[in-house]
């Protein structure tokens, strides 16, 4: 049930889709049923799944996949194929060709629109909620309404929501229904209708609109929900034997220890009605599929566990689009619906295989590719760029799984003969072509999506190649370690996981290569590492919980704050509440930090990247008009939607609830924020003009003295591009253009070309800020009235902050003037020091740098010569160990280059075999180490790279290199003498063991 998946702290991993995982043992399935509190695990034993089951693999169902029309054809393959035909051909009066995924989605939305529901667009996969990692349920965008934190905008709504879940990623492709990306169709009521309408409409939709045979539908209800049972049986007409009463774990949804809760009811489709009711416990995953979920929010759970009826009863439902498509299109799994299968077909053609004749392993890999490509396309479209942290890592991991899976099944290069190309863009093209109904914006971001996928794939292919090199080194170490201790060579589970997770090496390939070299693989250790990662991934999803009880009662009772700051910087207001250390008080005295709630305010509360205003609140005497209290406000935040929280310190007197105060915003700081906010809009327009319209905002900060703008782009900007961007912004500033602001319908604003921030939450009415002919954005921030007020714009820095994300920092307004004046002062000082004019500074600096480079080269050359002279004397001190000449010495303050020259000289001078290990501490708190081994020593199996790396650890560092030559460093020069002594002992022992 999706509400439970989103809200229950004990069941946040619960999926609205029954989860199937297969155990290693044959003929044994563990079915995880969707639960509200915890998972119920059933063990289905005995015989294998019957041939002909829609959920089976292999040769159970033989189908022609030549076209979408043919994909519904079933061919008898066993005695039970009559059941297969019964389970598929009886679905509805319409042919499978009528029920495309788009048609199902449209029918669902239109059905509820005809019943008074407002069709709302899918929200972003990046939720407007810091407690939620990714959008995992359709009700997420309505969460504040369900919790009473925001007023309802419409009485009831219907959506098709994009969702991402990766906590069971290893099951994708291996079961019939696990997916990372899916669509959740839903209808929602915010106190408008309740149980009877939800149930009867759900039945009408499934049986009349979609034409599902009523005799194939089973119902689950909460064991104590007699009302729902009665509606299903007495009003809808479902026989009692097909209505199952289940317990609290299965059919009762809670939002946490306290808060909104209620029973739920689920509709299941029966693939094998001829089996009767003997085993019909709805837990048979091969027989039943749950596809529609109705949650009845009717109670409030109190601290003592008791339930009280809610004043406003709500409805939250979810229907898995892919599941309904599977039923109506008569295919054996979600992947073979028209929502995913075109991507699979494309991947199969690139791998030069036929899905129809492919074995189970090949089909599994193709399903993984089909599923993951949908996920990455929608995530990147919603502004999630591949990186090593947070949501970016989810995208990167999915992309890498597709790349390594594609390579595993034989896709090379671009899949069309170009070995240097990338194949993900071709697959993404198919996914994008399927996106127009659910998210039309994906098509407009095609260029950006394809470019990001190509760059990420080519980078990862290089990583894979490095992984091959690492695997060779790890196998060498395993063989060497086994040789030293007499054990059997083994590749540790941690190393296998490193190759799998970081370098994308499939475990089976690692095991195969290791086996060829006689090395076993620690699969138990690998499984433990995988389980640890799974738990971490699960934890990321389990942060989805409500803040019910975290807000004090005073905040909940305060009405929204009226914002006056667009038109005025001062106002008279009434104190509606006071908080000190989170506790509600009536009076606060001098010296206390306080949070103040007003009925109205000119102070801007932090949002949209713009910081909250600073200023003062004043309390005056009623008779003498003298100041009785002064409160300095240093921050303003929003709480529970649109309640402004003024945070500050009582500088004088006291403030009391119910009293009138005068509020005054710091005008100079507000002007700085206005200049930087408008400059941010101009900067975004300039970026789109100079480097391409596909770039998009990834974040921003609008402060009083600076701005920071993060944007999605794959490379650093050149100096020329930065100059053009800066020049264009200043051109717009000097044009003295008047800004226009207006409030309009969201869709009208988008149609007019207004830019919306990815993932930002907007109401039906939005504020649009326009610089005519330059910029139009949805924005609730404060802005200058004319671009001339910005005064000037200067880019301070441009840098990368994550893979595919760049950041520009800049100044405008008074901060721009201060910055330019400071830079001018720096230039004056520089000219004075160099004794040149400003225009000659660059040339003079280049001359000085060239002279410095020449001097450094000369010094380095002299140091190397001195080091070689020292080395010449060391050659005479070499010891002989079993015919091998050995030199281990501390060369004092010789630098790394000199140390290298000395080692090369010694190993060339001494007769082969020879081993030279030198160390030095140049006096800068660092240690340099070098090892040079002649061919004779290398043939003994003694490698310089591994040897010097181990010694360097004693000096607080590390390093490595080739078998014959390696360098290392450290930061503990005091440990150098001891490290060299250990090096001497180990090289002597190694040579002696090889010679004996």
Swiss-Prot record:
This is Alanine--tRNA ligase, chloroplastic/mitochondrial. Its EC number is 6.1.1.7. Monomer. The keyword Ligase applies. It is found in: Plastid, Chloroplast; Mitochondrion. Keywords: Aminoacyl-tRNA synthetase, ATP-binding, Chloroplast, Ligase, Metal-binding, Mitochondrion, Nucleotide-binding, Plastid, Protein biosynthesis, RNA-binding, Transit peptide, tRNA-binding, Zinc. Coiled coil: none annotated. It comes from Oryza sativa subsp. indica. Catalyzes the attachment of alanine to tRNA(Ala) in a two-step reaction: alanine is first activated by ATP to form Ala-AMP and then transferred to the acceptor end of tRNA(Ala). Also edits incorrectly charged tRNA(Ala) via its editing domain. Its cofactor is Zn(2+).
């Amino acid at each position: 049930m999706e509400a439970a998946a989103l809200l229950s702290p004990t069941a946040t991993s619960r999926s609205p889709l029954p989860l199937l995982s297969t155990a290693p043992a044959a003929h044994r399935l563990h079915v995880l049923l969707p639960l509200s509190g915890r998972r119920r695990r059933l063990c289905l034993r005995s015989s294998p799944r019957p041939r002909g089951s829609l959920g089976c693999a292999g040769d159970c169902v033989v189908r022609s996949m030549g076209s979408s029309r043919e994909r519904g054809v079933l061919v008898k393959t066993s005695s039970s194929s009559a059941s297969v035909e019964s389970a598929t051909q009886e679905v509805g009066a319409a042919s499978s060709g009528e029920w495309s995924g788009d048609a199902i989605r449209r029918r669902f939305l239109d059905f509820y629109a005809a019943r008074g529901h407002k069709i709302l667009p899918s929200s972003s996969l990046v939720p407007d909620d810091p407690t939620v990692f990714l959008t995992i349920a359709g009700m997420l965008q309505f969460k504040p309404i369900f919790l009473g934190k925001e007023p309802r905008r419409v009485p009831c709504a219907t959506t098709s929501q994009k969702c991402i879940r990766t906590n069971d990623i290893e099951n994708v492709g291996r079961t019939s229904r696990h997916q990372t990306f899916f669509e959740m169709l839903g209808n929602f009521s915010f106190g408008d209708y309740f149980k009877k309408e939800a149930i009867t409409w759900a039945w009408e939709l499934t049986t009349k609109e979609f034409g599902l045979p009523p005799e194939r539908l089973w119902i689950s209800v909460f064991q104590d929900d007699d009302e729902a049972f009665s509606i299903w049986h007495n009003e809808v007409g479902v026989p009692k034997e097909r209505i199952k009463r289940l317990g609290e774990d299965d059919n009762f949804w809670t939002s946490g220890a306290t808060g909104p809760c209620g029973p739920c009811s689920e509709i299941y489709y029966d693939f094998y009605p001829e089996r009767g009711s003997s085993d019909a416990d709805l837990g048979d995953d091969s027989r039943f599929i749950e596809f529609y979920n109705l949650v009845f929010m009717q109670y409030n759970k109190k601290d003592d566990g008791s339930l009280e009826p809610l004043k406003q009863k709500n409805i939250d439902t979810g229907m898995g689009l892919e599941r309904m498509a599977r039923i109506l299109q008569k295919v054996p799994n979600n992947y073979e619906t028209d929502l995913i299968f075109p991507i699979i077909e494309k991947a199969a053609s690139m791998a030069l295989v036929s899905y129809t004749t492919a074995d189970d392993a090949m089909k599994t890999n193709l399903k993984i590719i089909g599923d993951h490509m949908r996920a990455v396309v929608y995530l990147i479209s919603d502004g999630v760029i591949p990186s090593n942290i947070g949501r970016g890592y989810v995208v990167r991991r999915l992309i890498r799984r597709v790349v390594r899976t594609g390579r595993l099944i034989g896709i090379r290069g671009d899949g069309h003969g170009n070995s240097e190309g990338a194949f993900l863009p071709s697959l993404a093209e198919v996914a994008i072509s399927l996106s127009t109904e659910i998210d039309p914006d994906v098509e407009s971001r095609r260029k950006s999506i394809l470019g990001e996928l190509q760059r990420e794939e080519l980078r990862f292919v290089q990583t894979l190649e490095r992984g091959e090199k690492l695997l060779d080194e790890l196998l060498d170490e395993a063989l060497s370690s086994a040789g030293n201790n007499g054990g059997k060579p083994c590749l540790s589970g941690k190393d296998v996981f490193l190759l799998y997770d970081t370098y994308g090496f499939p475990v089976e390939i690692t095991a195969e290569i290791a086996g060829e070299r006689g090395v076993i693989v620690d699969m138990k250790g690998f499984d433990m590492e995988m389980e640890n990662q799974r738990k971490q991934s699960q934890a990321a999803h389990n942060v989805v919980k409500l803040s019910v009880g975290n807000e004090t009662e005073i905040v909940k009772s305060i009405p929204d704050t009226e914002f006056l700051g667009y038109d005025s910087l001062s106002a008279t207001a009434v104190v509606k509440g006071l908080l000190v250390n989170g506790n509600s008080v009536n009076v606060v005295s001098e010296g206390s930090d306080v949070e103040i709630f007003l009925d109205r305010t000119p102070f801007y509360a932090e949002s949209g990247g713009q910081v909250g205003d600073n200023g003062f609140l004043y309390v005056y005497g009623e008779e003498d008009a003298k100041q009785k209290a002064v409160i300095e406000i240093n921050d303003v935040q929003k709480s529970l939607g649109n309640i402004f929280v003024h945070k500050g310190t009582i500088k004088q007197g006291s403030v009391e609830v119910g009293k009138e105060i005068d509020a005054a915003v710091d005008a100079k700081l507000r002007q700085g924020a206005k200049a930087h906010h408008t400059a941010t809009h101009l900067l975004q327009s300039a970026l789109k003009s100079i480097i391409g319209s596909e770039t998009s905002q990834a974040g921003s900060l609008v402060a009083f003295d600076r701005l920071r703008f993060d944007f999605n782009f794959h490379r650093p900007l050149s100096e020329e591009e930065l100059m053009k961007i800066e020049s264009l912004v200043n051109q717009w500033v000097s044009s003295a253009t008047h800004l226009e602001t207006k409030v309009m319908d969201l869709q009208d604003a988008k149609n007019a070309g207004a830019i919306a921030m990815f993932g930002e939450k907007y109401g039906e009415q939005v504020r649009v800020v326009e610089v005519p002919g330059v910029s139009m954005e949805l924005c609730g921030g404060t802005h200058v009235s004319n671009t001339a007020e910005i005064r000037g714009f200067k880019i301070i820095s441009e840098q990368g902050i994550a893979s595919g994300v760049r950041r520009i920092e800049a100044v405008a307004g008074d901060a721009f003037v201060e910055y330019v004046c400071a830079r001018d002062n720096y230039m004056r000082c520089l000219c004075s020091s160099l004794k040149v004019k400003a225009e000659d500074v660059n040339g003079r600096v280049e001359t000085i740098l060239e002279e410095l480079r020449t001097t450094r080269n000369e010094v380095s050359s002299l140091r190397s010569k001195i080091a070689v002279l020292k080395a010449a004397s060391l050659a005479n001190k070499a010891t002989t160990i079993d015919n091998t000449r050995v030199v281990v010495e501390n060369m004092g303050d010789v630098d790394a280059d000199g140390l290298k020259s000395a080692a090369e000289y010694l190993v060339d001078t001494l007769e082969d075999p020879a081993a030279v290990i030198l160390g030095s501490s140049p006096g800068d708190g660092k240690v340099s180490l070098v090892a040079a081994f002649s061919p004779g020593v290398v043939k003994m199996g003694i490698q310089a790279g591994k040897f010097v790396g181990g010694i360097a650890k004693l000096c607080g560092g590390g390093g490595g290199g080739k078998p014959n030559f390696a360098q290392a460093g450290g930061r503990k020069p005091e440990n150098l003498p001891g490290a060299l002594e250990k090096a001497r002992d180990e090289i002597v022992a190694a040579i002696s063991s090889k010679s004996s």
